[in-house]
Swiss-Prot record:
Protein name according to UniProt: Splicing factor Cactin
Role played: Plays a role in pre-mRNA splicing by facilitating excision of a subset of introns. May be involved in the regulation of innate immune response. Plays a role during early embryonic development. Involved in the formation of the anteroposterior axis with important roles also in neural development.
Start-end of Acidic residues biased regions: 605-617
Organism this protein belongs to: Danio rerio
PANTHER family assigned: POLYGLUTAMINE BINDING PROTEIN 1/MARVEL MEMBRANE-ASSOCIATING DOMAIN CONTAINING 3 (PTHR21737), SPLICING FACTOR CACTIN (PTHR21737:SF6)
Keywords, ordered alphabetically: Coiled coil, Cytoplasm, Developmental protein, Immunity, Innate immunity, Neurogenesis, Nucleus
Length: 835
């Protein structure tokens, strides 16, 4: 214990001696020797301030300061060393540094000795180590406190010295500033007087004023303000440089001394020497490297500009493509809308035609229905309409004709340009008939007298001029009349020629419809002959040059018969000519009133031309007369046949039964306006009801040979009519679901049948027909379904798929006999796979 106490007292005495040496080592002369001249002191002050700023910028917290103290150096010591290094003239400073170094070395040695002793004491006993640690900690804390107080006293003494120096130097600085400002103002005034002699009130430029103010501010500012201004300027330069380098606001406060990266050359340009050597440009100077980097940056900038231009061009092209696609899409949509509009028009046209058919079938047809049927019959079927279409206007009132005009407009819109000439001609004729009827109503005569009631001179002249002319002739006449009206003249009867021009349109429309009607008749007759295999002959021959009679072998023999035959033929021809002359004469008498001699000459010339050239168009009356003449001549008399000459299956109808059927058909036509359907047609139509898209007609019949019936001698056996359907569909089992889909479906299979057998003339109505399912001898997968009814019907059989039937009515099974129809409907069972 005594040794430990002795050691502790020795260490305490050493530390006290060291503190005395540090305190009393410097003499007052040495301390005052630090006060140098004002210029040197100001320079030293600036350096110390800049160094202080650096040290403050790069200094860390208290932990780092303690680390520096333990590392035998501190910021304050470094500062003292720098200031004493600059003032190497004073010997006192050097002595002070030497003494301080010796004291520090001694201190370090003592600390090392104390550490070694502590280690030894730790090894000797654990309790003594703990106490020694506490003592060492207290010693170090006390020494640190002493050092801190020492620094504070030194800094306060330095501040006092600085204030004293400022007070001494401030009057001298003020005098220097005043002298400088006076010399500058005198020089500026002399320069102004030399250059123009301008007065000071005129004033210098704004730049000179700013410069003067800046100079004045610099002359009057204190050293602290000057230092702050220069630091701010330097900081602004560094900030600008950093902004140019691309630094963000986060890194703007970093400096070479203060940055988290530990980079002492943070603000400088980084040069990767290894990369430069690898590229082979390590020998270049800094200026060349800068030029090279600048050149590379320019190239990159140009490349970026090119890339930007290409991108803009691509965007422009993309916008153009999108615009083109949009235009194409609009065109497609317009086409779709057009097709939809056409479909809508076709639908309305179909509905209008359907309404017309229904009205015609019910016997309440309107004029537009008859016209629509006439114009559609030209293309649809081979039915022949013998009358011209304008004959449907006979007997109509003004209201009916006005309704007809509206219906014609609707058909013209719906047909979209089809049959325009036909509807225009009908419109012209209808408007003319309406005007005639209104004139008759105004004159007080009914529509029955309209043909005979026109007594004006213009109408008789018009009828005499237009009688028997073709469409081309009427068109030429129309052009002549129009040119005559346009030419004018003093003796021209404008009213007559205008009425003539007004009526010629109507006659042109009638002539065009008549010629169209004749063309349609010729085409349909030609098609009928082609279907029947008849050799084509001239259509509607009127005048045939009779070939010269064969020279009789003996004129005496059979001369009486030839004379009789020739006389009869001549008589027939004379009668035909008389009828035609009477008809044409009557028509001319009705139509012609008074005519001028010029028009009579024209008519005679036209009749002469007609006599020379044979007519190519026949009217309905001409055809009737021709057929009547042929019938009278005996060419239509059928040959008489005996019963033995008839085939065995010929069905003979008695005259009374035929007459009754004819009278019944006539009564039905008078009541409904259309022939009713037969019983078998009704049966077929009833069997076709409800036929879906997954059903098809099934008419494959199996022949039954060697079948004899007991009632065959009493009734003639006949086969019944039938209308059968087969139901097909897809079976979506596991295999089909795996290998097929809705776009590529599996093959259809038969799922059921619907048999409709017609027995309208069954003798025994109480006995219902029956069906029998028999196996097929050729193939076990098929069966034969046979139907048996009774007299007068034979059995009938069909070959079907041999599968198990579904007899539940829920699955569509039906077996009934009603209204002369035997129905057998069934579906096959579906087998479900179950584990």
């Amino acid at each position: 214990m005594g040794s430990k106490k002795h050691r502790r007292s020795r260490s305490r005495s050493r530390s006290r001696e060291r503190a005395r040496v540090v305190r009393h080592d410097r003499s007052p002369g040495d301390r005052h020797s630090r006060n140098r001249s004002p210029v040197k002191s100001s320079r030293r002050r600036a350096r110390s301030d800049s160094g202080g700023s650096r040290s403050s910028g790069g200094s860390a917290g208290p932990s780092r300061q303690r680390g520096r103290e333990s590392g035998h150096s501190s910021d304050s010591d470094r500062q003292h060393r720098n200031t004493h290094g600059r003032n190497r003239d004073s010997s006192s400073d050097d002595d002070y540094h030497d003494k301080k170094k010796q004291a520090l070395k001694k201190k370090h040695n003592d600390e090392k000795d104390s550490r070694s002793r502590r280690r030894k004491s730790r090894s000797s006993s654990g309790s003594s180590t703990n106490s020694s640690r506490e003592r060492n900690r207290s010693k170090t804390s006390r020494s640190r406190e002493r050092e801190r107080r020492r620094r504070q006293s030194r800094s306060s003494s330095r501040e006092r010295h600085r204030d004293q120096r400022r007070r001494r130097n401030s009057p001298e600085r003020d005098r220097d500033r005043r002298r400088r400002s006076q010399s500058r103002s005198s020089s500026s005034s002399s320069s102004d007087s030399d250059h123009g002699g301008k007065s000071t009130q005129g004033g210098s430029s704004s730049k000179e004023e700013k410069k003067k103010q800046r100079d004045l501010m610099k002359a009057l500012e204190t050293p602290e303000e000057k230092r702050a201004r220069r630091l701010a300027k330097k900081e602004a330069k560094e900030r600008k440089k950093r902004e140019k380098m691309g630094w963000s606001e986060e890194y703007m406060g970093y400096t070479n001394a203060d940055n988290p990266f530990g980079d002492n050359n943070l603000l400088g340009t980084f040069i990767w020497q290894k990369a430069l050597e690898k590229k082979g440009i390590g020998h270049l100077s800094e200026k060349n490297l800068k030029d090279r980097n600048k050149h590379i940056q320019e190239e990159n900038r140009r490349e970026l500009q090119k890339v930007k231009q290409l991108r803009l061009e691509r965007e422009r092209e993309k916008a153009m493509r999108e615009q083109e696609l949009e235009m194409l899409q609009r065109e497609k949509e317009a086409e779709h809308f057009k097709t939809w509009a056409e479909q809508e028009d076709n639908f309305h046209l179909h509905q209008a035609k359907l309404r017309s058919k229904i009205r015609i079938r019910d016997g309440r047809a309107k004029p537009i229905d008859l016209l629509a049927k006439y114009i559609s019959a030209e293309d649809d079927d081979l039915s022949v309409e013998m009358h011209e279409p304008y004959t449907f206007l006979n007997g109509l009132t003004v209201t009916d004709m006005e309704d007809l005009l509206e219906d014609i407009k609707v058909y013209m819109e719906l047909e979209c340009g089809k049959n325009v000439d036909f509807w225009r001609d009908m419109t012209t004729i209808t408007e003319d008939e309406i005007s005639k009827l209104r004139k008759l109503e105004a004159s007080g005569k009914g529509p029955g007298d309209r043909r005979e009631g026109i007594n004006t001179s213009v109408s008789t002249d018009v009828q005499s001029v237009f009688k028997g002319k073709t469409y081309s002739q009427l068109q030429a006449l129309y052009m002549n009349i129009e040119s005559k009206i346009q030419a004018g003249g003093s003796n021209l009867d404008i009213g007559y020629w205008e009425s003539l021009l007004q009526q010629v349109r109507v006659y042109m429309a009638r002539a065009r419809l008549r010629e169209r009607h004749q063309d349609v008749l010729r085409q349909k007759l030609y098609k009928l002959k082609q279907e029947q295999g008849v050799e084509s002959e001239p259509l509607f021959p009127i005048i045939k040059e009779e070939p010269e009679k064969e020279q009789p072998i003996s004129r005496e023999a059979g001369s009486g018969e030839e004379e009789a035959g020739s006389s009869s033929q001549q008589a027939d021809r004379e009668e035909d000519e008389d009828r035609r002359s009477r008809r044409t004469g009557g028509e001319e008498a009705e139509r012609s009133g008074r005519s001028s001699p010029e028009e009579e000459k024209k008519g005679e010339e036209e009749e002469g031309e007609k006599d020379e050239a044979p007519e190519a168009v026949l009217t309905e009356e001409d055809l009737i007369q021709q057929s009547q003449a042929e019938y009278d001549s005996g060419r239509y008399s059928p040959t008489l046949l005996q019963n033995s000459e008839l085939p065995l299956d010929t069905h003979i109808i008695a005259e009374e039964e035929d007459l009754q059927r004819l009278l019944l058909a006539r009564r039905q036509m008078q009541v409904t306006g259309d022939a009713s359907e037969s019983a078998e047609d009704l049966f077929v139509r009833r069997a076709k009801e409800g036929m879906g898209g997954d059903e098809a007609q099934f008419s494959v019949e199996m022949p039954l040979t060697g079948k004899m019936y007991l009632w065959a001698d009493k009734y003639r056996p006949r086969k019944p009519r039938f209308f059968n359907r087969v139901h097909t569909g897809f079976e979506w089992n596991k295999y089909n679901q795996t290998h097929y889909d809705f776009d590529n479906p599996p093959p259809k299979i038969v799922q059921g049948y619907k048999f409709n057998i017609f027995y309208p003339d069954l003798i025994d109505k109480r006995s219902t027909p029956q069906y029998f399912l028999e196996p097929c001898p050729d193939n076990k997968d098929f069966g034969i379904l046979r139907f048996h009814a009774g007299p007068p019907y034979e059995d009938i059989a069909f070959k079907i798929v041999n599968r198990e039937w579904e007899y539940s009515h829920r699955h569509g099974f039906r077996c009934q006999f009603a209204n002369g129809i035997f129905q057998l409907w069934f579906h096959f069972k579906r087998y479900r796979y179950r584990r």
